[in-house]
Amino acid sequence: MTKKALLGLAVALLLPITCYLMLKYASETAVDMPRHYLLDTVVTRVDKGKMITDSIWHKTANIHLQNQLGDSVSLYDKEGKIIVADFFFTSCGSICPKLTANMSKLQQSFIRGGDLRKKVDTSIVQFISFSVDPQRDSVPVLKAYADRFGVNHDNWWMLTGNRDSIYKFAFEELKVDKFSTEPISPDFVHTSRFVLIDKEYKVRGYYNGLDSISISKLARDIGLLMLEKDKTQKSAVFSEIIDLSWLWLIIVLLVIFFVLYMQSRRKLNG
């Protein structure tokens, strides 16, 4: 076998590994996932002799309230779901109707299904609107308001309950007053912000619910979070491919060694 043929054989054997590694690198670097926002602490640990720094992101605490159907519900009832939250009150004559209308359009876009629906089940998205005037916004009032905007009750809650709990949740858990250019009074949560929460109850984005560009970004980020996997766990397929890549490498080395050995024997016999 000539050197040219040997090179061709090596390329043919190494090509599957090379393609896999290139695709893996491209898939990991091509898309920027929505960032985390609320940092609790930073911890350091030693792993195999190396100092590793881990960021511990704030996990949103649970809250128990009542929805527009009169059901007692909690945030943690929606385990494994991506959540889009906002704050409103039914008697609002300024921004709230527009916020609710935009949230409704967002919900309907996922119900009908876009390109993302071909790959992922959009039923994992939950919309939650917290009333900041719960004394007036009773269950019947919320139900009438929801029906007015064509709310699908299956994955959109409008919640009422204890005012202090709602306000504490807004400021201490979702921190709606942070990363904002608009002033938000601690006495009345009147904000145009939509908050994106991932499957682990961690805040992944703040958006202007009155701005079409910001809402489009929210829709995109929802899709990205739907595709997000637990990075701490390697998939079985990935592990098998890694094992096979070592097998390919061993085969290549054996073939090259065998070819070189046969060539050396021919020279000796010649």
What are these regions (language model features)?
Residues 182-269:
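Thiol-/selenol-based redox modules, centered on thioredoxin-like
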